[in-house]
Amino acid sequence: MERYSCKQLKSLVASGVAKDVTYANKRSDIPESYTQIGYAAGIYGCNGMLLKGESGQLYAVTDRTSAIYIF
């Protein structure tokens, strides 16, 4: 698993490489099974994560929200 900065995760979303699921409310917001391939951590713990679906689509949680605990 690779470590990213929150800025890197946000740039992946801005460039269209990853889909933003920061404010997702349920697991079904990602319509396929996925695995975690990266994370962003700071002094208060996990601040973001990068997920990869079985189709190859990337999903990013770019802020410290409840989506970190859902996924």
Question: What is each stretch, according to the model?
Answer:
Residues K19-F71:
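Acidic, low-complexity, intrinsically disordered interaction modules
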